[in-house]
Amino acid sequence: MALYTIGEVALLCDINPVTLRAWQRRYGLLKPQRTDGGHRLFNDADIDRIREIKRWIDNGVQVSKVKMLLSNENVDVQNGWRDQQETLLTYLQSGNLHSLRTWIKERGQDYPAQTLTTHLFIPLRRRLQCQQPTLQALLAILDGVLINYIAICLASARKKQGKDALVVGWNIQDTTRLWLEGWIASQQGWRIDVLAHSLNQLRPELFEGRTLLVWCGENRTSAQQQQLTSWQEQGHDIFPLGI
């Protein structure tokens, strides 16, 4: 029977080891074996279970309810992510930044960056993106807390083995998405730095020797896609980002 370390499982299942530990310790979702030295070992059944957990979470189920679902108990799973958006909005409206940071940090331990970005942060940020001054202020607070949290995550990820990459925005307006995309990439094995401002004209030769991960917004233009392909054919280490 094959056994896998937590690092190997993280790569196989595309999930952060911190999240795997949280699923085990806080929620009792996993029961890995242990070596004599105390290191976790997972078998193929564990990997199947992890993938099933991810499927439930991606469908909007809160982590705290997944264990009952795995036990075939009846659970109300409707509107899970909408509920989490409302919780986050309540923290924003309270003005208590410490509680807001703590809540986001806990979610970051419980869920993969891709899942949180897709189902929580992007939808709520869209709700706040309007001309109403109060909502604009809440969005500014949220973005500041997110960037601060993600910067800490990226700094921690850079201490691990991986390939260095620079996240670059190409002709975009929403620079917070650069940080969210960089966070996702960091959980896929990249050691990420983020170029803080979007570039209207991207010139890969200015970043010679660097791997560039390029965010063009949610819908790349055909011209951008053609140019990215051309740069790759010229030997530039450049790849598009996107959920």
UniProtKB/Swiss-Prot annotation:
Transmembrane regions listed in the UniProt entry: none
Keyword terms, alphabetized: Activator, DNA-binding, Transcription, Transcription regulation
GO terms (BP aspect): regulation of DNA-templated transcription
Boundaries of every HTH merR-type domain copy: 3-72
Knockout-associated phenotype: Knockout mutant no longer produces curli, is mannose-resistant haemagglutination (MRHA) negative and produces smooth white colonies on Congo red agar.
InterPro entries noted in UniProt: DNA-bd_dom_put_sf, MerR-type_HTH_dom, MerR_fam, MlrA-like_C, MlrA-like_helical, MlrA-like_HTH
Regulation of its activity: Activity is regulated by DgcM and PdeR.
DNA-binding region: 6-25
Single GO MF descriptor: DNA-binding transcription factor activity
One Pfam entry name: MlrA_C
Gene3D superfamilies membership: 1.10.1660.10
The protein's role, per its UniProt record: Activates transcription of csgD, the master regulator of biofilm formation, by binding to its promoter region. Also controls the transcription of cadC and ibaG. Part of a signaling cascade that regulates curli biosynthesis. The cascade is composed of two c-di-GMP control modules, in which c-di-GMP controlled by the DgcE/PdeH pair (module I) regulates the activity of the DgcM/PdeR pair (module II), which in turn regulates activity of the transcription factor MlrA.
Assembly description: Interacts with DgcM and PdeR.
Listed name of the protein: HTH-type transcriptional regulator MlrA
Classification of source organism: Bacteria, Pseudomonadati, Pseudomonadota, Gammaproteobacteria, Enterobacterales
Gene symbol of the encoding locus: mlrA
